[in-house]
Design a protein with these regions (language model features):
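Cofactor-binding active-site loop characterized by glycine-rich and histidine/acidic residues
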Residues: 1-108, 115, 126-143, 149
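Structured core elements
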Residues: 87, 113-115, 156, 184-186
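Short acidic, glycine/serine/threonine-rich loops at helix termini
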Residues: 96-100, 124-129, 167, 194-200
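Active-site cavity-forming subdomains of large catalytic enzyme subunits
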Residues: 100, 104, 114-120, 167, ...
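Short, ordered loop/turn segments at secondary-structure junctions
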Residues: 117-120, 159-160, 188-190
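Short beta-alpha connecting loops at secondary-structure transitions
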Residues: 119-127, 150-158, 203-212
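Glycine/aspartate-rich loop-and-adjacent alpha/beta segment that forms the canonical ThDP
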Residues: 175-232
Length: 232
């Protein structure tokens, strides 16, 4: 924790998990021009606790787009073109907050992009023991947006395929920003070099075959190769 407000403006070191956040007000209490900066809403430690907040943040953009009374606040929104980005691990999608938020997003039609990082495990528990069909995107298919209905868009992409990630994210976010149709990006085959945490070894619950696969398809290694091959 850092008690320097310039380094940790959210709590001055009082929030010991020290999640990142950005200021909404300057040192004199005046609102900042949020529409002209990237804004981070501080994360929370309880699993899936970020989900309800994302609904409010995304709904704000919809209100700014649709309400003439809010057009005067040009420093807070650019005609509702903002997108709320939310990340969550695949195991946390089993929490009720996740389902309530996704359902609300589908009903409200708000600019929300939810990225599910899926490494196949909830700490040490394989996802087939906690997620229907062993896949959150498969479980959500009934919420897929169809013509003349509300709902969400669902995208599937592999975590080690960075070229495809860029293409899917770019097209998907552009659609969310333009149409305010929310989307879930299910990013599968994520790898963890040291398992869930350094407090225990994933060698205790992953098979030798799985560990060998993770070494071969390590997302960091594949990103490095992609950067070199693309001369980035």
């Amino acid at each position: 924790a850092d008690t320097n407000l310039e380094n940790e403006p959210f709590s001055g070191g009082r929030q010991m998990s020290n999640h990142f956040t950005s200021d909404n007000f300057d040192d004199h209490g005046n609102p900042l021009a949020l529409a002209h900066q990237k804004n981070i809403s501080t994360d929370m430690a309880p699993t899936a606790a970020q989900m309800p907040r994302t609904i409010g943040l995304a709904l704000a953009s919809k209100l700014f787009r649709n309400s003439e009374a809010l057009k005067q606040f040009a420093d807070l929104s650019t005609n509702g073109d903002e997108v709320c980005f939310c990340t969550i691990g695949d195991a946390s999608t089993s929490e009720g907050h996740f389902w309530e938020a996704i359902n609300a997003a589908g009903v409200l039609q708000i600019p929300l992009a939810v990225f599910v990082w899926d490494d196949g495990y909830g700490i040490s528990v394989p996802k087939e023991y906690q997620t229907t069909k062993g896949s959150i995107s498969a479980a959500l298919r009934g919420m897929q947006k169809r013509p003349d209905t509300n709902g969400i868009d669902i995208y599937n992409v592999k975590g080690w395929n960075y070229a495809e990630l860029c293409e899917v994210f770019e097209a998907g976010i552009e659609k969310i920003r333009r149409t305010h149709i929310p989307a879930v990006f299910h990013v599968e085959e994520i790898t963890q070099p040291q398992g869930h945490s350094t407090s225990g070894s994933h060698e205790r619950y992953k098979s030798p075959e799985r560990l060998e696969w993770e070494r071969e398809w390590d997302c960091i290694k594949h990103m490095r190769n992609w950067l070199i091959e693309s001369s980035i």
